[in-house]
């Protein structure tokens, strides 16, 4: 599927990310997704689509991950502390210089924590006092995992699959923002440049899938959970 097709099909977002048309011009009423879309269109930079920045929290990701894992494994976790740690972890993961936490151990640890958290949430009644905090923990862990995957798939070693992060960025765009009248052509010029690069990288990805499928599979396998999570979310959005 081309980036243009993806933009057309992702026509709505979950209630928590949906703004009203009457408040579209009010920056205070914009959904997080709309804010990110505006930033992405204005800059034409991949990091803007995910809210990634070089000024993100400088906290040590690996240290936070270990602390969070120990707290989650307690027989009776302190859920407010757990939620705060997960929030700090997600913030730390948003930095665009995250190479130090891309080791296999960190990936497996985080994926294991997400599975544990999702399982625990599934067995927690919605009426339980800990439910909302646990749901928040799960969302922040998945957010950290997304940024972990983006950091790795945009690295030189993953050049053959560089089109994947571009596609993940494009499916998160808010079509209502894209449909607005251009406020300034320079913004759209930058975004158009990104689209051109994304089309080229997606074409290269398609070619690599045909001619180097085993290598591509090895590169993508560690990030299958991220890709499936994002794809599943978009399918839920469009009603499948």
UniProtKB/Swiss-Prot annotation:
Biased region (Low complexity) positions are 9-23
Entry-linked InterPro entries? T3SS_HopW1-1/HolPsyAE
Region (Disordered), start-end ranges: 1-32
Q: Which UniProt keywords apply?
A: Plasmid
Q: Does the keyword Oxidoreductase apply?
A: no
Zinc in keyword set = no
Family, similarity comment: Belongs to the HopW family.
Listed name of the protein: Putative truncated effector protein hopW1-2
Q: Which gene encodes it?
A: hopW1-2
